[in-house]
Amino acid sequence: MAVMVTLTLKTDPATYQSLHEQMLELARPAGLLFHSSYEVGGQVGIVDYWPSEEAWNAFARGPLAQGMKLAKIEPPDDVKVTPLIYADAR
C-alpha cells in the first residue's frame, strides 16, 4: 500500500539544496514516487510518496541515514508515515 511520508529536516534550505540531487538519485531507484519540500521555520519540510512503508523504511535506514550522517544533519524527530487509500501521479 502506498504511503505519504512527512518530516522536517533539521537543516537550512541552502544545505538541503546542495544535497538534494544526490539524494534523489538514490531515492528514485529505491521506489520514491513523488518528492516535495518547503521551508518551515528556517528548516526544510518534506512530503514524499512511496510505494510502501517497507520501501520507505529501507531508504530511510540506509541511504538517507548515511547521507544525513555524512552531512552532519540530525535525524528528524517528527516522521509520520500515512497509508494512502489512493495515489495517482498522473
Q: Model-derived features: where do they sit?
A:
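Short S/T/G/P-rich N-terminal loop/turn motif that feeds into the first structured element of a domain
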Residues: 1-62, 66, 72-90
